[in-house]
């Protein structure tokens, strides 16, 4: 315990400062170092507290499901919500930082401050005195009867004992919303309260393991294993083939792939109602889901979003349950970002703050055809190798359980990734301090193509390319395997596509179920669901299209695409082929500008 020196001098000389016994001057107080032989300047109002670095607020959110694993969705002083890199946290007044539960923000928001007994000055005491919540929060009962913390002052506790709403708002548990006179917004989920005076061994302040960023978010993983919905919602398949979120648990997904109904009700699409034995309710509209993007460790294994890839003692990849984590030297444990591993105490340390470290779990094989993170859409890739092969480029690949590495010659080689080997310069692979034998040579994707592709007795193209006849005679090499040569003699398309010379694109035709549909005559008599104009109507789930006579016609697809010939239409997500008789999926379109141009062939020896 530090002893403060010169309090009487402090009162009399705030401007001049404090002169310590060793003649140095301190602005507030002098504190003797261990042993008492020397002194250091200190501030008793700050130095007797545990401090930790605050976190930066991230992207906007509506619920914890919008944030990476281990993050929380906190309400800011501006009334908005943002992701904080702590599982339970509060936003700082500066609007840019946040602190973990059990801490206060410093004035500038850059530091999180905690008293040694973890009993916060200004913390909200729950009835009974056994539990407390952070300042500017509200105590609410949880499902198990214990106390939880709503991260808003004077909040309204919802009857389900799971959610809460801001002061003055009412809970709409049917639609999972907080309703005010100005509008509505999603319900907030309560957090468990913390026991008062919680301390670790020898009085060392710690953070409860339940409050670590390793805590899983409250979310529902959809059947495709890559989309997720907020807690207390239901995944429903949309017409696009992706998953949407119905805003209630155990909901009924309607057959139109657009609406949903509460549990124990039936969808009545004709009347747009949810029917039950007692009463009918209006159909609910589904909301988009959020996609979970895996963290790739290498070409074969990955970790869930919000986790970090770390090497295990076996050399294989493991997953640390923190984002941007610190991998400990024992290859078994890991710590949150900003902490260091203390192997003797089995803890993670940041200044005076200590938290238990986490144990890594083995990484999982990457899911096939995993989508890329959001970004500008590029052209679909040409057909690749079988999923069991590890593709190095369009021509060569490695066997399963390997990674592609460049040899000294510039050619491809293979290292055994299943044993944790990494690529090294030259002819070797390495894992830790252990070298592997020489790299194995990669093999061609098609083992039968061991020589150039012969166009005729005079010309040939490299392996993995296709011979195409030129318009003026002779041959050109299409830089795609098994390609389709276009009739203009200048372009080519990947296998499975057809050439649309007029549109300068490669198109993949839809199956028979997506042939363009002829337009039907609209009705002028009865009152139907979709109004076209000029007193013309189409049935519900149909689309109004102009016909060739300038009048209205009905497309049998919901949100259909009207073809330019004014006689046909296509489903949503497709576009009409130039002649209007077929529908082409938008994702099955390759513009010629995005494809390699045919090159000159090689003379045969």
UniProtKB/Swiss-Prot annotation:
Q: Please list the disulfide bridges.
A: 126-139, 133-149, 297-309, 303-319, 310-327, 320-334, 328-341, 335-348, 392-404, 398-414
From the UniProt entry, list the residue stretches annotated as the region Disordered: 359-386
Q: Which GO terms describe its cellular component?
A: cerebellar climbing fiber to Purkinje cell synapse; endoplasmic reticulum; extracellular region; extracellular space; Golgi apparatus; late endosome; lysosomal membrane; lysosome
Instruction: Output the PROSITE patterns linked to this UniProt entry.
Output: GRANULINS (PS00799)
Q: Which Gene3D superfamilies match?
A: Granulin (2.10.25.160)
Q: How is it modified after translation?
A: Cleaved by ELANE; proteolysis is blocked by SLPI and is concentration- and time-dependent and induces CXCL8/IL-8 production; granulin-3 and granulin-4 are resistant to ELANE. Cleaved by CTSL in lysosome thus regulating the maturation and turnover of progranulin within the lysosome.
Described function: Secreted protein that acts as a key regulator of lysosomal function and as a growth factor involved in inflammation, wound healing and cell proliferation. Regulates protein trafficking to lysosomes, and also the activity of lysosomal enzymes. Also facilitates the acidification of lysosomes, causing degradation of mature CTSD by CTSB. In addition, functions as a wound-related growth factor that acts directly on dermal fibroblasts and endothelial cells to promote division, migration and the formation of capillary-like tubule structures.
Assembly behavior:
Progranulin is secreted as a homodimer. Interacts with SLPI; interaction protects progranulin from proteolysis. Interacts (via region corresponding to granulin-7 peptide) with CTSD; stabilizes CTSD and increases its proteolytic activity. Interacts (via region corresponding to granulin-7 peptide) with SORT1; this interaction mediates endocytosis and lysosome delivery of progranulin; interaction occurs at the neuronal cell surface in a stressed nervous system. Interacts with PSAP; facilitates lysosomal delivery of progranulin from the extracellular space and the biosynthetic pathway.
Return the protein name: Progranulin
Q: Which species is the source of this protein?
A: Cavia porcellus (Guinea pig)
